[in-house]
Amino acid sequence: GYKTEGIISSQDIAEAIPKSLQDNIFDMTQLLLRGQIQSVRELVHDLRLQGEDEIKLIAVMLGQFRTYLQVKLLSAQGKSEQQIVSSLSDCLGRKVNQFQVRFALRDSRPLSVAFLKMTIKILVETDYQIKTGTLDKDYLFDLALLKIVSNR
């Protein structure tokens, strides 16, 4: 996928640089929240081909949805972005990135607390089912994604 002629654009560079798992999960979450399940499936397929495991995908997604829920609850208490960064940093025992909070505030705005709690519950249950080997992990992960989309 390298360009052999013409001017190299920033998009060409972006396409040539592999995305981090975090970036891919962020994209997947955005697609999921927009109900674009086919695009989500394609991205998950690509991640599986890259050797990413469902348990790892769930762990990163859980982190993202927990952050959404935390910033939504703190924002509802009237806390500013800076106060949220400070509260989460204290709670987690590590410095939380301000941009992560800013994007989480923006992305969680249209989501209900009930939806976020339900999504976290679905991901935790799916993680448990995969780890206990009740059913095929690909099937369980796909089912979790469908449940999340249908609860939006």
State each model region's role:
Residues 24, 33-152:
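Helix-rich C-terminal "collar"/helical-bundle subdomain used as an assembly and partner-interaction module
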Residues 1-26, 31-34:
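Long, charge-dense, solvent-exposed interaction surfaces that engage phosphate-rich ligands
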